[in-house]
Amino acid sequence: KARPDDIEWLYELNRKSFLKVVIRQFGKWDEAFQRQIFFSKWEKPRPAQIIEKGSDRVGVVILEQLEDCNWLHEIQICPNYQSHGLGTALLRDLLADARSRGVPLCLQVLHANQDAKRLYARMGFQEIERLANHFLMEIS
């Protein structure tokens, strides 16, 4: 579980994960605005699980089990641990959990985050809806 003292590390992970995507989609990264958005999400406790490999923190998963779906708020892997199958393995575990509950695994992905969208499509996620800034995707 994420602890309050993890919050700055989580922000840096968020920044590393989304900086290029946000610039591609919105044209710039406004540090003050991004910090405000990020920290406002943490004003109430979030179901965050820090992913560790050995003694290293390498990512985070924020999953909420709702009545009609498992909602994947975030899955972020440190850039130097990406492309090694960790995200795919985590998604498989999350999908198995959703299937055991008999609900789909749902998420949103920014339009400009094509690497993530390709990963989700490869895993079998279907695009359900195109929103203003995101694709809504799910897999059963």
Predicted features by range, described:
Residues 1-12:
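A short beta-loop-alpha structural element at the N-terminal edge
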Residues 88, 111-136:
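Conserved active-site alpha-helix within GNAT-family acetyltransferase domains
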